[in-house]
Amino acid sequence: MGSIGKKLISLREIEGVASPHQRQVDSALAARQKAFEYVKDVVGLAKYIGGKVESLGIGEDWSLSKEIFPGVRVYFVFVKGDEEFPGSLKVLFSGKNINVMKGEDLAGFVILYVNHMLRYVRETNPDANLPEVCYRV
């Protein structure tokens, strides 16, 4: 099921332009993004974090959603890099209760789940030479 019609917003849109937590999340995702090129089974990854695969229709290679609080969903959106453009891992949020969450809490959930996803990458690629970040979680 796609997410057309759902309002997807960034942490910056929740907290405002000067969001320190958006910078924290961006930095954490940039350091971990390369590892997600090793994901072979997106459905398996979604199950591993208790989420689901969702097509957002925004040019992503894959995206997962996870309800982190009643009425609050986080979307992990991955685009593989190529010769012309670097890959990216982004996070968006939606839900009727998004405004009751603090940016600090949302950032913490994001980093927690991204680290958990790195464990999946490590466990499902035992013989691969993975990025160092996979071995630090």
Residue spans of the language-model regions?
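Short, highly charged C-terminal tails/helix-capping segments
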Residues: 124-137
